[in-house]
C-alpha cells in the first residue's frame, strides 16, 4: 500500500475539503491511504469520516499563528513519518506558503504535487506578493503541477511548469447529490417555505463568493416577489456584515443564514434556484453539486470557468449588468424545470466530472513514479 500526505483540509467544510473527501471515498483504499496534514489543532471538516476510512490526521500550528512553532512542528512530523509517504499532495488557493513542499524535498520525498484550486488572489496583498514570488520558484520544489481548471493553472504556473500542468476535475458523487423530493418537502415544511420561491447559495461567506451582491439582487427580486426567501448555507468572515446588510435592506425576515450543513443534497433539493455571483473561482465544487441536483443555476460570466457548465439549465450572466438585470434573469431562471437525473448522470460522465470514473485516474497519477 502507498501512503500519500495530503494538505488541504481546514475547519471549514468548503470546496477543497469536499473535493478531497469525495476522492478519498472512491479511491481503492487497499492500494492507497491518505494521511492529512492540518495546520490547526482543532478538528477539521469531515475528520471523523476520514479517520473511519483509514486516514490519519496530523495537526500542527499554522504559520500565521506562530511561524517558529509551525516550522518546528512541520520538521518534527517529517522527521518522524516522512519515510512512510511516497508522495506529498498540497491543495491550496495560493503559493504564498510552499514550506510543505520545501520540507518534503528536504526529507527525500520524491513525488511532490502542488494543486491549484483558485484563479485569483483571495488573501491579503502581502500573500499576493508572496504568491507571485513563489510562482517563479515552484518548479524547484514541486515535481507535479496540478490544477482544477485552465484558469487555475495559469494562476499558479508559467513557462515550463504551465506546460507540465495536469487538469484534475473536481469530480463529485453524482448519486449522492441527486434531487430528493422527500428531503425537499421536509426542509421546506420545517422552515415554513412550502409555498415560497427559495433562492439558495452554498459556500464560504467571503468576499470571493460575492454574497453581498446576492443580497442586492434579492432585494430587487423580493420587491416583485415578496413570497420569496434567500438562503445562505455556509459560514465565514462576512456573516456579520451580510446579516447587518440584510437588516438594512429590510430583508431580515426573508434571508436565512443556515450555517454549516452536512446534508447538502437536502438543501439543494429545497432550492428553486442556485444563485452564484462569485467574483472569482477555480472550478466550483458547489456549482457542480448544484448541477448534480438538477436545480437551475445562475452564475457569474467570465469569472467561473466555462467548463463548469454541465446542464442546460445553467446560465452565465455578467456581473457588470447590475442587480436589476440579475433580478430579471433570476425571475426567468426560476421558471425553468430541474434537469432529469438520467441526463445529468450521462453528462457528468461524458465531461469527466463523475467521481465513479475519475477516482481511478487520480489514483493512477498519485501512484505513478
Please place each PLM-identified region on the residue numbering.
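N-terminal strand-loop element at the rim of the active site
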Residues: 6-14, 18-73, 77, 237-239, ...
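A conserved mid-protein helix/loop that constitutes part of the nucleotide-sugar donor-binding site
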Residues: 14-22, 197, 201-220, 237-243
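A charged, aromatic-enriched C-terminal amphipathic alpha-helix characteristic of glycosyltransferases
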Residues: 15, 337-369
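Acidic anion/phosphate-binding donor-loop and adjacent secondary structure
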Residues: 65-69, 154-158, 169-190, 195, ...
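Aromatic "clamp/platform" in nucleotide-sugar-dependent glycosyltransferases that forms part
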Residues: 93, 260, 279
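Active-site donor-binding acidic/aromatic loop of nucleotide-activated sugar
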Residues: 230, 238-241, 252-261, 267
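Short hydrophobic beta-strand element within catalytic cores of glycosyltransferases
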Residues: 296-301, 306
Amino acid at each position: 500500500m502507498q501512503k500519500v500526505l495530503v494538505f488541504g483540509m481546514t475547519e471549514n467544510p468548503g470546496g477543497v475539503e469536499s473535493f478531497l473527501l469525495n476522492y478519498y471515498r472512491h479511491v481503492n483504499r487497499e492500494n492507497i491511504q491518505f494521511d492529512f496534514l492540518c495546520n490547526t489543532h482543532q478538528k477539521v471538516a469531515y475528520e471523523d469520516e476520514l479517520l473511519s476510512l483509514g486516514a490519519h490526521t496530523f495537526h500542527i500550528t499554522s504559520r500565521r499563528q506562530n511561524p517558529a512553532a509551525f516550522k518546528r512542528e512541520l520538521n518534527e512530523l517529517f522527521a518522524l513519518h516522512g519515510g512512510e509517504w511516497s508522495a506529498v499532495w498540497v491543495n491550496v488557493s495560493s503559493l504564498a506558503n510552499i514550506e510543505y513542499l520545501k520540507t518534503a524535498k528536504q526529507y527525500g520525498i520524491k513525488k511532490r504535487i502542488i494543486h491549484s484550486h483558485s484563479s485569483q488572489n483571495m488573501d491579503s496583498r502581502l500573500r499576493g506578493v508572496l504568491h507571485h514570488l513563489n510562482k517563479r520558484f515552484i518548479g524547484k520544489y514541486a515535481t507535479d503541477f496540478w490544477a482544477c481548471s485552465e484558469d487555475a493553472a495559469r494562476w499558479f504556473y508559467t513557462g515550463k511548469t504551465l506546460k507540465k500542468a495536469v487538469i484534475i476535475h473536481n469530480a463529485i458523487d453524482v448519486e449522492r447529490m441527486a434531487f430528493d423530493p422527500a428531503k425537499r418537502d421536509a426542509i421546506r415544511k420545517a422552515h415554513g417555505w412550502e409555498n415560497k420561491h427559495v433562492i439558495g447559495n452554498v459556500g464560504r461567506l467571503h468576499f470571493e463568493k460575492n454574497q453581498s451582491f446576492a443580497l442586492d439582487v434579492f432585494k430587487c427580486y423580493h420587491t416583485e416577489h415578496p413570497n420569496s426567501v434567500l438562503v445562505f448555507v455556509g459560514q465565514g468572515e462576512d456573516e456579520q456584515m451580510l446579516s447587518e446588510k440584510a437588516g438594512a435592506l429590510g430583508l431580515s425576515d426573508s434571508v436565512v443564514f443556515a450555517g454549516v450543513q452536512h446534508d447538502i443534497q437536502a438543501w439543494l433539493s429545497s432550492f428553486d434556484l442556485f444563485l452564484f455571483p462569485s467574483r472569482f473561482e477555480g472550478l466550483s465544487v458547489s456549482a457542480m453539486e448544484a448541477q448534480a441536483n438538477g436545480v437551475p443555476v445562475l452564475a457569474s460570466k467570465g469569472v467561473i470557468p466555462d467548463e463548469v457548465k454541465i446542464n442546460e439549465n445553467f446560465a452565465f450572466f455578467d456581473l457588470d449588468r447590475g442587480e436589476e438585470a440579475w433580478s430579471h434573469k433570476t425571475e426567468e431562471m426560476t421558471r425553468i424545470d430541474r434537469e432529469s437525473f438520467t441526463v445529468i448522470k450521462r453528462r457528468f460522465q461524458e465531461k469527466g466530472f463523475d467521481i465513479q470514473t475519475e477516482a481511478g485516474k487520480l489514483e493512477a497519477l498519485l501512484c505513478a513514479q
